Curated annotation (Swiss-Prot):
Compartment list: Cell membrane
Entries under InterPro entries matching the protein: CASP_dom, CASPL-5
Assembly and binders: Homodimer and heterodimers.
Transmembrane segments: 22-42, 47-67, 82-102, 133-153
Keyword Hydrolase: no
Main location: membrane
Source species taxonomy: Eukaryota, Viridiplantae, Streptophyta, Embryophyta, Tracheophyta
Stretches assigned to the Extracellular side: 43-46, 103-132
CC terms in the record's Gene Ontology section: membrane; plasma membrane
Keywords: Cell membrane, Membrane, Transmembrane, Transmembrane helix
Protein's recorded name: CASP-like protein 5C1
Claim: Glycoprotein is one of the keywords in the record: no
Protein topology in the membrane: Multi-pass membrane protein
Amino acid sequence: MENRERAGAGAVGSAGSLGLRVGQAVFSSASLLFMSVGVEFFSYTAFCFLVTIMGLVIPWSCTLAMIDVYSILVGCPLRVPGVMVIVVIGDWVLAILSLAAASSSAAVIDLLLQFHGSHCSPRFCGRYQLSAMMAFLSWFLTAASSLFNLWFIASR
């Protein structure tokens, strides 16, 4: 029984999963907010990509957080193998896309800062840096969630 509880610690339907999903939603929302505050982000494809991916992560995380809340309240965690595979694949795809978006945005920000602010005002570049940092944190939580759920599937 103890191994099953450990295997399901971060799997869908557990309190650990709820914490991961809330963290994903918070960091993705913060990344989207910091990027969208400046209207200039439309000029760079990497920033548009980041906004698009964070816009996908937010509803995915919120939906799975609602499933986690329901599973915790009812006391019956969602352990259907087919659904777990879909969650793992969705997390995996979003984790890869989040990493790509955060990395490309960070690279563009670094390039803009190389020009000593001639292409990006310090106020906007600071916001873009915060947005990329929040996207990296969201990616980390999404990847962790994917690994926890994959571990649960493999342990069954």
